A protein has these predicted regions:
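Membrane-proximal intracellular helices of multi-pass ion channels
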Residues: 1-445
Length: 445
């Protein structure tokens, strides 16, 4: 017993997080395989159940079966629970239940909780976890109440379940919808393109869920005093605003020409918000221009913010790389923002994460394109959606073969935990050698 305990203690935080996600995915897949999880009462093939489970836990939204028509009420509930666990994080959920039971949280557990939500320090982590969980449920409840009249007006009493499901799915940046029928599969929110309440509610839920729990805490503590926010919170909020407004303006002038002005504004904003990293869509994505799809791919790869329900390489990674490039152009040794320097190791970690995401995105797209005989651009859209844990699709995912689906499963999983794992691997267990190799310059650019 002592040896088992010793081994558990040796597991680093990032390994616990990675194994926690994997455990929930496998358990969810086994449950979804059961006949009572599908409306037809049949056993779902393991690879399809695994794909759905991975997509839910990694809060992606890519599916191989229509969620609304294929899965039973029980199956949809299981998917929703996995979305909630995946959005909050396995460690955060486990820690919250431990606190509810009155158990004392050890220092090692607090350290793991700190890593799971990207907190700057261990102190106050229990208070922060309570704040996150309570805030999550409150925001999801508000989102549900706002959407209730619209969904109940169309679906009657079933509208309560519809509002709850889509509120949680939006806040957790999952992108799963249950609006599909046997006659109209995979509709997402295309039927609500001109409905202001649903559009605005979903967009706000996505944004709030995607800015990160620490940013919430900063806003809650300092209210609207922007100057008092942490540098990270400032960078997140400004970067998020830029990555919403700039693409929305581009989409407005390049797409949706046939829509009335109000719907065109809503459609442009919605398609700008959702690629980071929610996966809902109100517009016909294949009909959008090639340049708009390229911008959406970039947005999908960037994703949300650290310590949030969103995936992707993160807004801070993107911002650090841009700031670093500006510092080079200005012939400065360090990247600077809001009167602070950004540490060189942070820039290296950002570059490492960005390279990893781009390699996964590109290699995955090439393999799927080769295996399926599909255009590379279409396959790259799907792999960006998978590795960014977004869920947007040009409609090819349900038709892909098992090999291609397995590739997307791996991309979704690595997209959710891969960047985190690489960063922790880079900053932990460093072997500082006294002797160093000779330095030699290499020309770049």
């Amino acid at each position: 017993m002592s040896e088992i305990t010793h081994r558990k203690k040796r597991l680093s935080s990032f390994k616990l997080i990675v194994l926690g996600f994997a455990s929930v995915i496998v358990l969810g897949a086994l449950i979804l395989m059961m006949p009572f999880s599908s409306t037809a009462g049949v056993v779902t093939p393991f690879h399809e159940a695994l794909f759905t489970s991975t997509s839910a836990v990694c809060v992606t939204g890519l599916v191989v079966q229509d969620t609304g028509s294929y899965w039973s009420a029980f199956g949809q509930t299981v998917i929703l629970l996995m979305i909630q666990i995946g959005g909050l994080g396995v460690v955060t959920v486990a820690a919250f239940f431990a606190m509810l039971s009155g158990r004392k949280i050890s220092l090692m557990q607090r350290s793991t909780m700190q890593d799971a939500i990207s907190a700057p320090k261990v102190g106050g982590i229990v208070r922060l976890t309570r704040f996150i969980v309570r805030g999550t449920f409150l925001i999801e409840l508000i989102g549900m109440i706002v959407m209730l009249p619209t969904f109940c007006g169309k679906f009657g009493i079933k509208g309560i379940w519809m509002a709850a499901f889509h509120s949680i799915s939006a806040f957790c940046n999952a992108g799963f919808d249950i609006l599909g029928t046997a006659e109209n599969k995979y509709p997402s929110l295309t039927g609500y393109i001109g409905e202001p309440t649903i559009n605005i509610a979903i967009m706000l839920l996505i944004i709030v869920g995607g800015i990160g729990f620490l940013t919430w805490d900063d806003i809650y503590t300092n209210k609207w005093h922007f100057k008092k926010y942490r540098m990270q919170s400032k960078v997140i909020l400004v970067t998020t605003a830029i990555l919403i407004i700039a693409p929305a303006v581009f989409f407005f002038f390049c797409d949706f020409m046939g829509l009335p002005l109000g719907e065109r504004i809503l459609a442009s904003l919605f398609q700008s918000v959702t690629p980071r990293t929610a996966g809902f869509n109100t517009a016909d994505l294949p009909a959008m221009t090639g340049s708009s799809k390229a911008i959406m791919i970039l947005l999908m790869l960037v994703g949300g913010s650290p310590g949030s329900t969103a995936g992707g390489m993160k807004t801070t990674t993107f911002a650090v790389l841009i700031l670093s490039a500006f510092s080079v152009c200005r012939k400065k040794d360090d990247a600077e923002v809001y009167g602070r320097r950004i540490d060189g190791s942070t820039v290296k970690n950002a570059a490492t994460v960005a390279v990893m995401y781009f390699l996964l995105f590109f290699i995955g797209g090439i393999v799927i394109s080769t295996a399926e005989g599909l255009p590379l651009s279409t396959c790259l859209y799907e792999t960006a959606s998978a590795v960014g844990t977004v869920g947007l699709t040009l409609g090819i995912t349900p038709q892909l073969g098992i090999l291609s689906q397995l590739i997307l499963i791996v991309l979704m999983y690595l997209g959710r935990v891969g960047g985190l794992t690489l960063v922790y691997a880079a900053i932990s267990n460093k072997n500082q050698s006294v002797a160093k190799l000779p330095l030699e310059k290499i020309t770049v650019g």
